[in-house]
Curated annotation (Swiss-Prot):
Protein name per Swiss-Prot or TrEMBL: Endopolygalacturonase I
PROSITE patterns membership: POLYGALACTURONASE (PS00502)
Gene: pgaI
Enzyme class (EC, first level): hydrolase
GO BP: cell wall organization; pectin catabolic process
Compartmental location: Secreted
Prosegment residue ranges: 18-30
Temperature dependence: Optimum temperature is 55 degrees Celsius.
Gene Ontology molecular-function annotations: galacturan 1,4-alpha-galacturonidase activity; polygalacturonase activity
Organism: Aspergillus oryzae (strain ATCC 42149 / RIB 40) (Yellow koji mold)
Homology family: Belongs to the glycosyl hydrolase 28 family.
pH effect on activity, per entry: Optimum pH is 5.0: Stable between pH 3.0 and 7.0.
Length: 367
């Protein structure tokens, strides 16, 4: 009996002396399900978790909610309201990355950039240094779905990856319409192969979509309001200057400067090929219903097209609707021989005034 008591006491001492499991090992042992309430905690420990819940996180000023090291196959869920401290810096405020990642949100959640603190009407062209919102970079076979994002300081999503799906995303920067919001692009896509954006609902002050380079890109079922329209370009003077196999379809552009557009940089080299705009409805477009021009320089048109970025195998099919009284339904400004193999049908845009400045319109198209 005395021996048994001593044995039990010894066992108890050993148990007491054993080190407590680390926070990381606890997460792994519990099936890798983690709820975080701070950005630092999430960024440091996300790689240990298969299911990540971000609950009412207030990201400190000048810091990134960095989820780029999430483990393969992880699911990231935003709950409540995610906010960010104020600082003049380049950002991003959030970073995603990884393989087979799913990013989603709980019902009623919102990611609020509180952009009015930075808005000054200048965007990225001066004034306050403004952080970009969300980098979705180095994503492979991943999905971002159902997010509600509002009040971005400047550009919202920067997308670089392969086989990336962005589904049913709401971007509401409408507060910036009368408060100095500028350069609030919804989706900037570059250096990607396979990006599929479906069901986006966007209110902003710049491009709803801007494709700067990449291939096999689809943008379908979108509603774009208040910005600059659905764009390819400007193409040229980047590390990658090729855009091919793009489909934009079944979408509506409302109260925007432009409906659909392709713009290439004057004097640059590159290519745009295999682009289809199909079944696009335009409403109250302020400047150009359809605009395709090869004359951009220093952020604006020059009126003098160049031929270094040819636009070939373009299909414009079923683009209909209206432009404002002072707008132009269609504007085409191509270099000599640098726009070819176009298919143009079912284009019917009412209102505005026909342009007399179109140049080198390819066979089959009309201006």
């Amino acid at each position: 009996m005395h021996f048994q008591l001593l044995g039990l006491a010894a066992l108890g001492s050993l148990a007491a002396a054993a080190p407590a499991p680390s926070r990381t090992s606890e997460l792994v042992e519990r099936g890798s399900s983690c709820t975080f309430t701070s950005a630092a905690q999430a960024s440091a420990s996300a790689k240990s978790c298969s299911n990540i819940v971000l609950k009412n996180i207030a990201v400190p000023a000048g810091e990134t909610l960095d989820l780029s090291k999430a483990k393969d196959g992880a699911t990231i869920t935003f709950e409540g309201t995610t906010t960010f401290g104020y600082k003049e810096w380049k950002g991003p405020l959030i970073r995603f990355g990884g393989n087979k990642i799913t990013v989603t949100q709980a019902a009623g959640a919102v990611i609020d950039g509180q952009g009015s603190r930075w808005w000054d009407g200048k965007g990225t062209n001066g004034g306050k240094t403004k952080p970009k919102f969300i980098y979705a970079h180095k994503l492979q076979s991943s999905t971002i779905k159902g997010l509600h994002v509002k009040n971005s300081p400047v550009q919202v999503f920067s997308v670089q990856g392969n086989d990336v799906h962005l589904t049913d995303i709401t971007i509401d920067n409408s507060d910036g319409d009368n408060n100095g919001g500028h350069n609030t692009d919804a989706f900037d896509v570059s250096e990607s192969n396979g990006v599929y954006i479906t069901g986006a609902n966007v209110k902003n002050q710049d491009d709803c979509l801007a494709i700067n380079s990449g291939e096999n890109i689809e943008f379908t079922g979108a509603t774009c309001s208040g910005g600059h329209g659905i764009s390819i370009g400007s193409i040229g003077n980047r590390d990658s200057n090729t855009v091919k196999n793009v489909k934009v379809a079944d979408s509506t552009v409302v109260d925007s400067d432009n409906g659909i557009r392709i713009k290439t940089i004057s004097g640059a080299t590159g290519s745009v090929s295999g682009v289809t705009y199909e079944n696009i409805t335009l409403k109250n477009i302020k400047k150009n219903g359809i605009v395709i021009e090869q004359d951009y320089k220093n952020g604006g048109p020059t009126g003098k097209p160049t031929t270094g970025v040819p636009i070939t195998d373009l299909t414009v099919n079923g683009v209909t609707g209206s432009v404002a009284s002072k707008a132009t339904p269609v504007y085409i400004l191509c270099g000599k021989g640098s726009c070819s193999d176009w298919t143009w049908k079912g284009v019917s845009i009412s209102g505005g005034k026909k342009s007399d400045k179109c140049q080198n319109i390819p066979s089959g198209a009309s201006c």
